[in-house]
UniProtKB/Swiss-Prot annotation:
Function: Presumably involved in the processing and regular turnover of intracellular proteins. Catalyzes the removal of unsubstituted N-terminal amino acids from various peptides.
Keyword NADP tagged: no
InterPro entries in UniProt: Leucine_aapep/pepB, Macro_dom-like, Peptidase_M17_C, Peptidase_M17_leu_NH2_pept, Peptidase_M17_N
Record keyword NADP present: no
Pfam family, one: Peptidase_M17
Subcellular localization: Cytoplasm
Cofactor dependency: Mn(2+)
Gene Ontology molecular functions: manganese ion binding; metalloaminopeptidase activity
Lineage, highest ranks first: Bacteria, Pseudomonadati, Pseudomonadota, Gammaproteobacteria, Pasteurellales
Family: Belongs to the peptidase M17 family.
Protein name: Probable cytosol aminopeptidase
Length: 499
């Protein structure tokens, strides 16, 4: 799909379809008002007939509107004028695509980005429009013999802005939106790939591909032999039950004006399949454990978006690839592991493996002297119980960093909710035989997992995102969501603006 922005008036435009918004109570958007005036009150008379009441999700296709050069006009319901939310706006964009795809239209000019969405600027309206449109078009049919049919003939959408002053912000929104939408697609494709294909070596291969595609990126791969030399014994213990060796992929993006500037580090949990190990998971929905590398997929997609946006930052992305399987060589409940930073961990449950992989990865990244570290992980079902599937869990030992992430999440409409950490939760991680236990009991599971990780992040500013409830959807619409790429990309955009 080709996207562009322009600033023109309704009467000047000659395209296959104009797209304008109509609110409830017969209220017209500003573009619809212009169209109504040019057409001699055609829209006013039409609305009085009651064929469209302006509810979110409605649409009405018109042909040969008087005094309008365009062949078609699509009216899209936008709800109540002063109450339009980001979620409703995205639904409006999806309905627009559904209606257009039912026609032979190849090019359309869209005025819906003029809508007032919680006082968002044109930048955000363009961002959300493109992200929504690309999400609505996404299909993963790589392994289907019969590919999904291309729905509709639309190949170009031109977003019209109110004036020339808005064009610069609109173009910036366009650039960022296309990069972020592309990153989300990369993340979805990685996460949706089946685990017999997408193993730790596959993650490493894709990571190396970014270095081929972008001159600002260099990638190196840490294999199991190097991990053993480094003392990454917790990471290796998780991997030892699998025939697929672990690989830690290090993606370095260097584009800061000061080459010595401290990097932002993103660490993604990359369990390409998590059977639970000896503490075997129930078979019901175990297929979805291919999504246990959603954190790595998000980091991969974010690095793609970052390279497309060419932000003036230094960023390191870590894909902590591993597989957790039951086997005669698998690690056991009762094992005591010596982590890379020297702390010992008693394994009480082999299905609490993500934190064991991450604790060594979080120690590994100390070598970068990072400005901050954010780990992203489908870490706990407990986070889903606490927050559902709408908000990712946010935990941090640094309030300023947590506030930055919360702000970026709100801006990007990629929501998070902060959960506490503290010494009270550390008590739950006590072991009779080691420095730490790898689980903290029945209560507060998402928090105790974050608390466990905090023991390995003492040398830098750190935050943890638990995306177990947001990285993928189950049911009829099963598939990866691409989250939290928008949040992470926005965090990096904000950091770049501070430089």
């Amino acid at each position: 799909m080709e996207f562009s922005v322009q600033s023109s008036t309704i009467e000047q435009l000659q395209t296959e379809c104009l797209i304008v918004g109509v609110y409830q109570d017969h209220q017209l958007s500003s573009a619809a008002v212009q169209l109504d005036q040019v057409s001699g009150g055609y829209l006013t008379r039409l609305l009085q007939m009651g064929d469209l009441d302006g509810s979110v999700g409605q649409s009405l296709l018109l042909h040969n509107v008087p005094n309008i050069k365009s062949a078609r006009v699509l009216l899209v319901g936008c709800g109540k004028q002063d109450e339009l939310t980001e979620s409703q706006y995205k639904k409006i964009m999806q309905q627009m695509m559904h209606a257009i795809n039912a026609t032979a239209v190849q090019q359309a000019v869209c005025f819906l980005t003029e809508l007032m969405v919680k006082q968002r600027t044109i930048y955000w309206n363009i961002r959300f429009a493109i992200e929504s449109i690309q999400a609505s078009r996404y299909v993963y049919d790589v392994f289907k013999s019969i590919k999904a049919k291309v729905v509709g003939k639309l190949t170009q959408i031109i977003f019209n802005v109110a004036n020339q002053q808005d064009l610069l912000e609109a173009e910036r929104g366009l650039k960022h939106a296309q990069a972020i939408a592309s990153g989300m697609i990369y993340a979805k494709n990685m996460a949706n790939c089946p685990p017999n294909i997408c193993n730790p070596a596959y993650l490493a291969e894709l990571a190396q591909g970014l270095a081929t595609d972008y001159q600002q990126i260099q990638t190196r791969i840490v294999d199991e032999a190097e991990m053993a030399t480094l003392g990454m014994n917790a990471y290796l213990a998780v991997s030892q039950g699998s025939h697929n060796p672990a690989f830690l992929s290090v993606i370095e993006y260097n584009h800061h004006p000061d080459p010595s500037a401290k990097p932002i580090v993103l660490v993604g949990k990359g369990l390409t399949f998590d059977a639970g190990g000896i503490s075997l998971k129930p078979s019901d929905a175990m297929d979805e454990m291919k999504y246990d590398m959603g954190g790595a997929a998000a980091v991969y997609g974010t690095m793609k978006a970052l390279a497309e946006m060419q932000l003036p930052l230094n960023v390191v992305g870590i894909l902590a690839g591993c597989e957790n399987m039951p086997d005669g060589n698998a690690y056991r409940p009762g094992d005591i592991l010596t982590t890379m930073n020297g702390l010992t961990v008693e394994v009480l449950n082999t299905d609490a493996e993500g934190r064991l992989v991450l604790c060594d990865a979080l120690t590994y990244v100390e070598r970068f002297d990072p400005a901050c570290v954010i780990d992203i992980a489908t870490l706990t079902g407990a986070c889903m119980v606490a927050l559902g599937t709408h908000n990712s869990g946010l935990m941090s030992t640094h309030n300023e960093l947590a506030d930055e992430l919360f702000t970026a999440a709100s801006q990007a409409n990629d929501k998070v909710w902060r959960l506490p950490l503290g010494e009270e939760y550390q008590e739950q991680l006590k072991s009779n035989f080691a420095d730490l236990a790898n689980i903290g009991g029945r209560f507060g599971g998402a928090i105790t997992a974050g608390q466990f990780l905090s023991n390995f992040t003492q040398k830098y500013r750190w935050a943890h995102l638990d995306i177990a409830g947001t990285a993928w959807q189950s049911g009829v619409a099963k598939g990866a969501t691409g989250r939290p790429v928008p949040l992470l990309a926005q965090f990096l955009i904000n950091r770049a603006q501070q430089e």
